[in-house]
């Protein structure tokens, strides 16, 4: 295998992968924990600071067609500083650089997937290809064989270091028990209302995640091919399933047709696919079908995340559309948001509402703000009803209130790989400058 002992430049890894591919050994590399990369994972230059190029984009996408969206050490969808208008952006954020002791802040720009998708559109618009046209998976990143993927059963990532709730910062540590907390390069404590807690990052880890792939059969070859074509999705732990198709005739389909998925493949493209410009101004439509984890919380809503680059002035735009609401509720056309479905969590017991939420949500949606001149990407985010976070479960089981600086509840979720829309002249740069502040 090729390791960082051979080189710390990922481009050298990709070139090595190309060489063994010539020998008949295909492989895929999965970029890992971009949220903690301090902006280095999705830079707008090469490892040595050279400008991006079509050759670089092709090399990277040939070898890294998939990116890890979520795992124990945080979720890499987006950051509140990058998506201030996204009410759900603050989800399992781990803001530290990977391996930093003491913990150092990881710069969000260039560290998160949604931002990378926008950067990729911009790079392509300026004639240097799109090196960030990747699909999505989730992963666990545990070092203990098993994975604590459920909030109510989160138990460890790295064994003895975080196997005890005191060590992972979810319940206070008595003075006489401080020696029982494993020393991992210097343990710090902070006083809160209920006592002294371990701080330093473990409290920001999450019970995540899972990879999903739509493969023709359950074989290594078929699953690998699904990864290669990016027909994949990620979840933050629950076994939510997501279907996502786009096309100009998708709006002619109906969920009452038992062969609707077969028809969607025939008239559209699945997640990971590309839509090209049509001669007409017709906007693309999208078929979305999400099903809950039967052992998890019911579904609350399905959203489409859209990012685009203006052809006229290269301004990036991000939109979050609620497209399907639980319990037969309807999206408010003024706000693009579902009404509150009434789902609540009892923080004393972690009991959740049993009479609200949906087992599945499905919809055919047409982009109301489509501009055929602007490059765009679309991906799905599915939200469950709120549940207790693992740290809250730890606290109530030990007889404490949840630690006050941590979220008491979360909304577990799933994300599809995107579908990209590309106008015919996307690679002919307009005569204006890039908005450098966005980068």
Can you name each region flagged by the protein language model?
Residues 1-439:
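Extended, charged catalytic domains and RNA/DNA-binding interfaces, predominantly
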């Amino acid at each position: 295998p090729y390791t960082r002992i051979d080189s710390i430049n990922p481009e050298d890894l990709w070139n090595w992968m190309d060489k063994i591919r010539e020998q008949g050994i295909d492989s895929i590399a999965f970029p890992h924990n971009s949220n903690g990369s301090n902006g280095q994972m999705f830079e707008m230059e090469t490892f040595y600071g050279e400008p991006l190029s079509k050759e670089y984009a092709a090399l990277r996408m040939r070898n890294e067609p998939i990116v890890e969206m979520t795992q124990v050490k945080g979720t890499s969808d987006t950051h509140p500083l990058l998506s201030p208008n996204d009410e759900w952006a603050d989800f399992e954020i781990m803001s530290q650089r990977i391996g930093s002791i003491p913990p150092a802040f990881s710069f969000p720009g260039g560290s998160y997937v949604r931002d990378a998708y926008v950067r990729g559109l911009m790079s392509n618009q300026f004639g240097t290809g799109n090196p960030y046209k990747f699909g999505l998976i989730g992963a666990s990143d545990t070092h203990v064989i098993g994975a604590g993927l459920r909030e109510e059963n989160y138990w460890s990532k790295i064994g003895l270091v975080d196997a005890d709730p005191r060590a992972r910062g979810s319940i206070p540590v008595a003075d006489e028990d401080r020696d029982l907390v494993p020393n991992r390069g210097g343990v710090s404590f902070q006083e809160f209302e209920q006592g002294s807690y371990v701080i330093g990052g473990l409290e920001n880890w999450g019970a995540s995640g899972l990879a999903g792939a739509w493969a023709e059969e359950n074989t290594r070859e078929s699953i690998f091919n699904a990864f290669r074509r990016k027909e994949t999705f990620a979840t933050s732990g629950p076994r939510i399933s997501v279907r996502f198709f786009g096309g100009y005739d998708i709006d002619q389909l109906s969920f009452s047709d038992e062969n609707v998925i077969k028809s969607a493949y025939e008239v559209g493209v699945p997640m990971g696919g590309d839509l090209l410009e049509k001669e007409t101004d017709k906007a693309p439509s999208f078929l979305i079908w999400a099903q809950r984890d039967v052992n998890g919380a019911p579904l609350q809503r399905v959203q489409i995340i859209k990012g685009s680059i203006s052809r006229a002035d290269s301004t990036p735009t991000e939109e979050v559309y609620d497209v399907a609401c639980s319990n037969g509720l309807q999206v408010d056309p003024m706000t693009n948001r579902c009404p509150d479905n009434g789902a609540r969590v009892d923080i004393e017991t972690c009991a959740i509402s049993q009479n609200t939420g949906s087992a599945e949500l499905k919809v055919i949606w047409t982009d109301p703000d489509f501009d055929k001149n602007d490059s765009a990407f679309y991906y799905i985010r599915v939200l469950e009803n709120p549940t207790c976070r693992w740290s809250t479960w730890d606290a109530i089981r030990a007889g404490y209130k949840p630690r006050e600086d941590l979220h008491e509840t979360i909304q577990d979720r799933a994300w599809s790989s995107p579908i990209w829309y590309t106008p015919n002249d996307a690679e002919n740069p307009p005569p204006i400058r890039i908005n450098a502040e966005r980068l």
